[in-house]
C-alpha cells in the first residue's frame, strides 16, 4: 500500500507467498500488482492472452471493478491452498523415465513430482512417458482379466446413479474444500491438521450418500473422492515433516525453522498391508548440475534489502 517494491522476483513460489503474507500481517497491505509502466503493446498482449485464454473471467472481473491496467494497480491476495505441484515437486514420484513405483504405471504433467514446466513441459514429459510406456507394454504378454474385480469397481463408480435421494456432489465438494481451507491452510499447526484428518474421515459417509443424475454429476462425484484422498495425503505429509520449508507453503508454527540435518529429503506416502497411509523418507539424489552456496540459499532471499542509515 506504500507503493514500494518488496520482492526481487515476481515468479510465484512459497517464499514469495511468505513475503506477501508478511506484508499483509505487518499492516503494510494490501499488496498491488503494478503494470501501468508497461508499453501499450505489452498490456494489450496480456489482455489478449489472459482474458481470452488463460483466465476468461479475469477481464470481466476487473471491468466490473473499474480496473484499467493502464492507470490502475491490481489488488492482489494469497490464493486458496492447492496441491498441484505445490512447491515444484509434490506429486506422484517418478524417475527419469516417468515410471512410478507401481510397475507399468507412468505419470507426467502436474500430477508427477517434477518441476514447474507448464504446457511445453507437459508435452515433453508426456512424450517420453508415452514412449517408455509403449516400450513396456510391448514386452508384456496379455493376461486374463479378473472379471469379478472389474464388476465390483464398476458397481462402486456407478453407485451414485442408483442413489435417488442422496447428496448433490457439488455440496459435498464445497464442504470438503472448506475443511481443507480451514484446517490445512498455512500457517499450519498440529492441532488443526489432526482435526482435519478427523473431518476427512467423517466425510467418507457423505461421499457414500452422493447422488448423480447424469454423467457430468457422476464425474463430480468421483472427483470428490479423489479430493478427499489428496486432502488426507496433504495432512499426513505435513504432519510427518516436522520443520518449515518452502516459505509459506509449509510453514508450521510449532516447527518454524528449516531443519536440513533431519529433513533435507523427500517425504513420501504409501499404503501399508492394511491399506492405510504411512509416511517415509526418501533421500535426495545428487544434483545433475551442482549449485554453489549462493544459489542454494537464493530462494530464501527474495525480499529486497534496504540500507538502514545508522543514527549518529
Residue ranges and their predicted role:
Residues 5-8, 87, 93-107, 111-312:
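Glycine- and aromatic-enriched mobile tails/lids
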Residues 1-75, 85, 132, 136-138:
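An anion/pyrophosphate-binding glycine-rich loop and adjacent beta-alpha core
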